Amino acid sequence: MSCLKLLTSLCAAASLCIGTAQSAEPVKIRVSWIAPITNWAPMLAEKKELARHLGKSYVLEPVRYVGTPQMITALANGELEIANLAFSTLPIAIQNAGMSDLKVIADELQDGVDGYYSQGYMVLADGPIKKVEDLKGKVVATVAAGAAVDVAMRTMLRKHGLEDKRDYAMVEAPLPTMRAMLADKKADLVPLVLPFALDPELRRIARPLFLNRDVVGVTQLLTWTARQPFLDKNRDAMVDFAEDTLRITRWYLDPANRSEVMAISGRVTKQPPERFDWAFTRRDYYHAPDMVPNLDALQTNVAMMKDLGFVTTSIDVKKHADLSIFEAAAKRLK
């Protein structure tokens, strides 16, 4: 009789374990973004039918931020799993915010790659600013101190002998408001990223004073980053997520899907689809195959942060990279 009771207890325990495993919640993966189309997170959400593991091993939650510096706080507070950090905010997160466990896991986009788009820093076409030196005593707009566009602007102005506060004033404004800042003459120079840079209203009144590639050449502008403990704890779910992500990004980059890509772009921006014939073409930022980042370019880029005094020492980028998750996902799709 005691054997029967033991067998019954073992069966019940096994049943409980199976039930617990089956009822395990999918891993929540919150991914940051700033601009639609330019950032992958909102675009992934538009092609959920290609995400075979979505709702099973993980759930996706795109979260919008004003700029990459705010993502550092969210990462530190456990409010974000994947941050699309700029080269400028990566060393700040690692050194200043003390997140030594932060890892680069994938590419989001690169600027200045030969034959692809490079973002512009715009002035009024009929205004007085003809060269960088003309910005002395003027107002320059930025997203946030330490953001990628901010660092590129400061670097270019320094090359021409101009320093913040001493030679020009800097004001902060969200990217969608930059056209109005320029048009209303609240700023003399504004940074513009896609898709805002191709706004027809902007193009009618503005011209680029310089391009990002003029400052530093190829820029590993944005990378996906995550903290190592989260990656270690949720590796299987992350590989599933990476597999779905690569499947979707390949779909967007396929010229055969151009019409639907334009329709999606129009929907997420609430603008006419025909404005987005540039999206995911050579007129766009460069998106690396299988989202493999250019770590050599990134190493060069982060060195600017030390030069500008945002961090005290440079970091070894390769020691803060873990590309194995997306590598494993890419192998699944071959």
Description of each model-found segment:
Residues 302-334:
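Conserved C-terminal helix/tail region of periplasmic/extracytoplasmic solute-binding proteins
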Residues 232-312:
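Secondary-structure end/capping motifs
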Residues 88, 98, 176-267:
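Pocket-lining segment of extracytoplasmic ligand-binding domains
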Residues 18-23:
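Sec/Tat signal peptide C-region and signal peptidase I cleavage site
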Residues 24-163, 169-172, 188-194, 218:
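Short, glycine-/small- and polar/acidic-enriched structural segments
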Residues 1-3:
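N-terminal secretory signal peptides that target proteins for export/translocation
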Residues 5-17:
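Bacterial N-terminal signal peptides
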